[in-house]
């Protein structure tokens, strides 16, 4: 539960704390290819989650999907807004942090429920 609730967000948090403030012009320059990579993560994470028969793996792949949505939002505002556009940057950061927090709570609760079901039934499929 700790892995999905906290550790999976560390890369995105590091991006927000290091890359965004130090390299805003470069981020604006490379935002379009990064947008495509994030969109690929959204699509591939969703399809990988749909193919799973194990519930824990399904939640893990949907976590990849949700974190790709966060990256997609950040790269979209980096592509659309200039680095000096304070209102768009604050809105994107606030929305991304809220999504990260909500995903941490919901994914942890889902893994807790899956563990309970596994204990009660003995199977995850």
Where are these predicted regions, by residue range?
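Hydrophobic transmembrane alpha-helices and their helix-loop junctions in integral membrane proteins
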Residues: 1-125
């Amino acid at each position: 539960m700790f892995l999905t609730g906290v550790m999976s967000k560390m890369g995105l948090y590091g991006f927000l704390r290091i890359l965004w403030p130090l390299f805003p012009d470069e981020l604006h320059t490379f935002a379009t290819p990064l947008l495509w990579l994030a969109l690929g993560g959204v699509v591939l994470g969703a399809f990988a989650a749909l193919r799973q028969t194990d519930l824990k793996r399904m939640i893990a792949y949907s976590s990849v999907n949700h974190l790709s949505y966060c990256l997609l939002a950040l790269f979209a505002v980096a592509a659309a807004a200039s680095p000096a556009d304070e209102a768009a940057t604050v809105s994107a950061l606030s929305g991304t942090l809220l999504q990260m927090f909500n995903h941490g709570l919901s994914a942890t609760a889902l893994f807790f429920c899956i563990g309970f079901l596994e204990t009660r039934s003995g199977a995850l499929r």
